[in-house]
């Protein structure tokens, strides 16, 4: 399986303020240009579904750290591919059927921003299935949702690590 996992520190630990007891608010979930281009194929309503899946994953993983008045996590879904055709795709192409399968996945990035606008940390994660036989039985956005869950876990672990180290 192709896994691209990177957490990139925007600044060194000495240049960042302590995160202990600082709440994190979920900011805007934006869409990257590639995703917007693909939305023409799979339908605009799918963007809202993807943002909802990502927000749910982040809220679940960051439950103990969410709040106002601290940092803001701004997230961008760069790209996503469904494992099964969307309604818009099936309506536009006779060859597609709801049982059609494909390799899905997503690419996501985020910035953790302090109240003064300083970017404290950036995150990036992308994942795709490598083998079409792996996606048999999957729902429409299974790989994208898996990507979002792993990304949220990565962000949560990073925030916990920063809070524990006081940087």
List each model region and its residues.
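Short secondary-structure boundary motifs at beta->alpha junctions and helix caps
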Residues: 35-46, 118-154
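Bacterial N-terminal signal peptides that target proteins for export
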Residues: 1-6
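Localized chelating/binding microdomains
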Residues: 22, 140, 157
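Sec/Tat-exported extracytoplasmic proteins
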Residues: 54-66, 81, 116, 152-163
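Surface-exposed short loop/turn segments
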Residues: 68-119, 130-135
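A structural "domain/chain start" motif
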Residues: 8, 12, 16-54, 70, ...
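Short structured motifs
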Residues: 44, 59-60, 92-96
